[in-house]
């Protein structure tokens, strides 16, 4: 990911306890590097990175995301212009096991990633929370690429990480473990989610990766509720 970002004025790399040599590589490429604890709320470290930026515009991305050359040119044109917008959204192409998922609510996966410095912030409360923008927001034409999961082992590791964080958030929000929620989280919500993603939104058109995505998206609802139950037992 890092070499393709050399077109930018500065690259800020926040390493969250990685063990693959990424930090050293970032230092070799001249990035501004920082080491931070791997906070379960990823937005805490994103907020930290944003505070280190010195340019007029910020574009943030994760290690499994890529910016095609067409998107680079569009970004350059906007930065050089006198645009009225404070931020820009874009479409993201999600890839599971090397396949771009065009259906099942996976595309267009709208993301807000580019904004003027000082005009965007996270509340740092939840892993999936959106950037809060001061001002008008536009839309980019070109897509960003997202290689979500390259293999099953990588997927299961991320699945465990995110479901644990979401269970903790449910605990903080006061979600109860009771008979009504048993039905809600073990039956109704997973079944509805799978049916919508796989059949109504056409996830079946994406073959095995589409089935995998829809199934585990539904399973995540059950697993995070199981983990909530575990947390409550541990705290009782």
Model-flagged regions — what are they?
Residues 23-54:
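Conserved donor nucleotide-binding strand/loop of the catalytic core
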Residues 43-50, 57, 68-235:
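Catalytic-site signature of metal-activated, phosphate-bearing donor transferases
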Residues 4, 15-25, 38, 62:
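A conserved acidic beta->alpha catalytic loop
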Residues 1-10:
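Short, well-formed alpha-helical segments that are part of the catalytic scaffolds
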Residues 16, 55-56, 61, 65, ...:
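Residues lining hydrophobic/aromatic ligand-binding pockets adjacent to catalytic sites
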Residues 7, 53-56:
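Active-site acidic short loop of glycosyltransferases
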């Amino acid at each position: 990911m890092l070499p393709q970002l050399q077109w930018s004025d500065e690259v800020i790399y926040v390493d969250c306890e990685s063990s693959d040599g990424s930090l050293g590589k970032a230092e070799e490429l001249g990035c501004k590097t920082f080491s931070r604890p791997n906070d379960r709320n990823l937005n805490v470290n994103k907020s930290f990175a944003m505070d280190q930026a010195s340019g007029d515009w910020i574009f943030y991305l994760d290690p499994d995301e890529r910016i095609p050359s067409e998107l680079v040119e569009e970004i350059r044109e906007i930065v050089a212009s006198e645009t009225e917008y404070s931020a820009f959204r874009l479409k993201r192409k999600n890839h599971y096991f090397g396949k771009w998922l065009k259906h099942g609510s996976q595309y267009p996966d709208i993301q807000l990633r580019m904004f003027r410095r000082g005009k965007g912030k996270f509340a740092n409360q939840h892993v999936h929370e959106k950037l809060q923008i001061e001002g008008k927001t536009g839309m980019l034409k070109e897509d960003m690429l997202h290689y979500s999961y390259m293999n099953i082992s990588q997927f299961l590791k991320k699945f465990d990480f995110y479901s644990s964080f979401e269970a903790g958030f449910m605990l903080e929000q006061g979600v109860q473990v009771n008979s009504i929620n048993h039905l809600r989280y073990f039956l109704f919500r997973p079944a509805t989610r799978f049916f919508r993603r796989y059949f109504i939104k056409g996830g079946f058109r994406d073959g095995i990766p589409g089935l995998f995505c829809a199934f585990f998206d539904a399973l995540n609802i059950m697993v995070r509720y199981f983990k909530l139950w575990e947390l409550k037992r541990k705290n009782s």
